[in-house]
């Protein structure tokens, strides 16, 4: 399972929010490029970047920093936040980003998701950000009324290459992932599902392993890495592709 460090950009700085609240942003670094290099050097196989300014404004704000990160790193970078039209997505991918994550536009203009997935096969993912099972849009500030499972099914049918599923209520809380919601989404689609929100310990990461066989292919870790609650290299040894232990579908453990 992929362990994917998250870098959230706000005002040019690396921050973490609490349950999507911009007013509760905590700054963990003022050098996004340096932070990205740090995670890559620690063994990350992919990075997850979010332009929080862009998510709120509706168009990318931290594009220069994101492009620099994508060009400096030798690992894939996926980016979300403020991607709401074809040209913006094309510029992002042209800058070296491997995968664009669409959020608000997936709810408001699903036909665009289908068109982009056709134009850029394998590079268009969809972020499903849900609060109590209902999808939130526009930087998590608005409630769409659409269920996460319904949106997941629709986006998979339209050609999305992966789904990044965030439980807003657990984001930044370190209280553990929403396993029930992840299980429901993974069961509803046949494309990879990436978990996000709530990871606060190595135990939380291990709790995701039984879902790997059901389609949960990775987990995004943010605050837990920045506070030291989770060590990236330990996480990679525990659940990464080179882990020493596998977990069967029935939750029992066995040697790999």
Curated annotation (Swiss-Prot):
It is an enzyme of class 5 (isomerase). It comes from the Bacteria. InterPro entries: Aldolase_TIM, His_biosynth, HisA_bact_arch, Isoase_HisA-like, Isoase_HisA-like_bact, RibuloseP-bd_barrel. Its EC number is 5.3.1.16. Keywords: Amino-acid biosynthesis, Cytoplasm, Histidine biosynthesis, Isomerase. Pathway: Amino-acid biosynthesis; L-histidine biosynthesis; L-histidine from 5-phospho-alpha-D-ribose 1-diphosphate: step 4/9. It catalyses: 1-(5-phospho-beta-D-ribosyl)-5-[(5-phospho-beta-D-ribosylamino)methylideneamino]imidazole-4-carboxamide = 5-[(5-phospho-1-deoxy-D-ribulos-1-ylimino)methylamino]-1-(5-phospho-beta-D-ribosyl)imidazole-4-carboxamide. One of its GO terms (cellular component) is cytoplasm. It is found in: Cytoplasm. Gene3D superfamilies: Aldolase class I. GO terms for biological process: L-histidine biosynthetic process; L-tryptophan biosynthetic process. SUPFAM superfamilies: Ribulose-phoshate binding barrel. PANTHER family: 1-(5-PHOSPHORIBOSYL)-5-[(5-PHOSPHORIBOSYLAMINO)METHYLIDENEAMINO] IMIDAZOLE-4-CARBOXAMIDE ISOMERASE. HAMAP family: HisA. Belongs to the HisA/HisF family. This is 1-(5-phosphoribosyl)-5-[(5-phosphoribosylamino)methylideneamino] imidazole-4-carboxamide isomerase. It comes from Synechococcus elongatus (strain ATCC 33912 / PCC 7942 / FACHB-805). The lineage of its organism: Bacteria, Bacillati, Cyanobacteriota, Cyanophyceae, Synechococcales.
């Amino acid at each position: 399972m992929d362990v994917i460090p998250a870098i959230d950009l706000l005002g040019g700085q690396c921050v973490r929010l609490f349950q999507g609240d911009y007013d509760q942003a905590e700054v963990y670094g003022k050098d996004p490029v340096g932070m990205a290099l740090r995670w890559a050097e620690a063994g990350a196989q992919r990075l997850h970047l979010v332009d929080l300014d862009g998510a709120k404004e509706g168009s990318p704000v931290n594009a220069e920093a994101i492009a620099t990160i994508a060009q400096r790193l030798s690992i894939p970078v996926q980016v979300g936040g403020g991607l709401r039209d074809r040209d913006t997505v094309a510029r992002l991918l042209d800058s070296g980003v491997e995968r664009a994550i669409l959020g608000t536009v997936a709810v408001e203009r699903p036909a665009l998701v289908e068109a982009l997935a056709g134009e850029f096969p394998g590079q268009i993912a969809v972020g499903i950000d849900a609060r109590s099972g209902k999808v939130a849009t526009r930087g998590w500030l608005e409630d769409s009324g659409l269920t996460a499972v319904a949106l997941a099914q629709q986006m998979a049918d339209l050609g999305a290459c992966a789904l990044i599923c965030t439980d807003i209520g657990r984001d930044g809380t370190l209280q553990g992932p929403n396993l029930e919601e992840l299980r429901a989404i993974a069961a509803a689609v046949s494309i990879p599902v990436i978990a996000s929100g709530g990871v606060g310990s190595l135990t939380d990461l291990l709790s995701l392993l039984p879902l790997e066989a059901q389609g949960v292919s990775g987990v995004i870790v943010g605050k837990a890495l920045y506070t030291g609650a989770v060590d990236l290299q330990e996480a990679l040894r525990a659940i990464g592709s080179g882990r020493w232990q596998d977990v069967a579908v029935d939750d029992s453990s066995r040697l790999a």
